Design a protein with these regions (language model features):
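A donor-sugar binding/catalytic signature common to diverse glycosyltransferases
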Residues: 109-113, 130, 260-300
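Donor-nucleotide binding loops and adjacent catalytic segments primarily
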Residues: 24, 189-192, 197-266
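Conserved nucleotide-sugar donor-interacting segment of glycosyltransferase catalytic cores
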Residues: 96-154
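Conserved nucleotide-sugar phosphate-binding/catalytic loop shared by glycosyltransferases and other
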Residues: 11, 35-86
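C-terminal amphipathic helix plus adjacent low-complexity
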Residues: 326-364
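Conserved nucleotide-sugar donor-binding subdomain of glycosyltransferases
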Residues: 72-108, 115
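A nucleotide-sugar donor-handling region in carbohydrate enzymes
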Residues: 139-212, 235-238
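Catalytic binding pocket for nucleotide-activated donors in carbohydrate/polymer assembly enzymes
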Residues: 276-277, 281-332
Length: 364
């Protein structure tokens, strides 16, 4: 008998969607029936990738944070300004989820940092499986990086996902977690990318939709305008009309061409998002990263430098950029050695071994 799985995915940035597409593709090979809980913003992507899978629309609650945890006052202000009844929205989802499998509820709930399906699992006393990369922040050492503490990220995890039947944690870097039956650390959950012959003059720049901080992104672009010895392919949801005059800058929207562009570039300039860093490592691509004011990004950038996978932008100037470019070959060798040392198994095999043992989910 097929297991009925309700899977919910966050839509902030592109990392959650990219990761869940990989997981859904693997689950489709198994003895399961899937229903997806996705937002209006992301449903187009899921519909294009999985037209045969039923989808339930959700609205994701947004919690405002400050450095020591949740900012309840700002969260209240934002909630009032949205003029949407979040509880009513959840109940509408729950009514549909309760009978989403031809009148039957799911057997198992899976979530990638999505709260609606989590609350539903708790209310229905269903097994909840977390499939994300943020859960590692519950277990890694407590510290502060550049004035940003881990308290914010941990507060969100405790607020949304205080308890899980199992946590699969995707991580591009090694993490020392005390062995627990309900936790499995996976090699990064990424798609299989094909590496092409390198174009040494081509650099991909990725601006995550996570931020609208134009001032920060323009700092990066200002640094690039002087480097006419390279061609920069810039992916962004924002328009930068003042920079379109530079012939060595090409602007694109994130889409199908992104995979082709990173397959042959010589390096990537990006925010320190876990998913893209992981994909770059899989292709031996050095990273020059800037960070958003979150502990997760600060920690990812710290790991990039610790293992010599690239460099963090601090000054946004030509001297620092030159230092990065002059060491590309060193970074490539370090990335290759790092991957061979730490990525010794396949994420899908590790995940499915656990799913089979605990829940009877297996490839058909």
């Amino acid at each position: 008998m097929k297991k009925r799985i309700l899977l919910g995915a966050n839509d902030v940035g592109n990392g959650h969607i990219s990761r869940q597409k990989c997981i859904i593709h693997e689950l489709q090979k198994c003895n399961v029936e899937l229903v997806l809980a996705v937002t209006e913003k992301s449903i187009v992507q899921y519909e294009a990738a999985f037209p045969e899978i039923k989808k339930i629309r959700i609205n994701i609650p947004w919690i405002q944070c400050e450095n020591d945890g949740i900012d309840f006052k700002e969260t209240l202000n934002r909630y009032r300004n949205t003029k949407m009844d979040q509880f009513e929205s959840f109940l509408e989802f729950a009514v549909e989820a309760r009978q989403c499998f031809d009148g039957c509820p799911p057997d198992i709930v899976m979530t990638d940092f999505e709260a609606n399906v989590t609350w539903f699992a708790y209310a229905m006393d269903l097994p909840l499986i977390c499939l994300d990369q943020q859960s590692k922040l519950l277990y890694i050492g407590e510290e502060e990086i550049d004035g940003i503490t881990i308290a914010r990220d941990r507060a969100l995890l405790r607020f949304y996902f205080p308890k899980a039947d199992h946590r699969f944690i995707s991580s591009f870097y090694p993490i020392d977690i005390e062995k627990k039956e309900e936790i499995t650390v996976l090699p990064p959950v990424i798609r299989n990318l094909k590496k092409e012959k390198m174009d040494r003059s081509k650099i991909v720049v990725y601006f995550s939709p996570f931020t609208n901080d134009v001032k920060l992104l323009e700092q990066v672009l200002d640094m690039l305008t002087e480097r006419t010895d390279y061609h920069f392919v810039v992916y962004s949801k924002l328009d930068f009309k003042n920079y379109e005059q530079y012939p060595h800058l090409t602007f694109k929207r994130i889409g199908e061409t992104f995979e082709n562009d990173i397959s042959d570039c010589c390096c990537i300039l990006s925010s320190a998002g876990h998913q893209l860093i992981s994909e770059a490592i899989s292709l031996d691509i050095p990273l020059y990263v800037f960070t958003f004011p979150t502990y997760d990004q600060k920690y990812c950038a710290k790991m990039v430098e610790r293992y010599k996978l690239g460099k963090t932008m601090r000054r946004f100037d030509q001297i620092e950029f030159d230092d990065f470019l002059q060491n590309l070959e060193l970074y490539r060798r370090s990335i290759s050695a790092f991957r061979k040392k730490y990525w010794t198994s396949s994420w899908d095999d590790v995940m499915l071994d656990v799913l089979n043992e605990k829940y009877g989910i297996h490839r058909m």
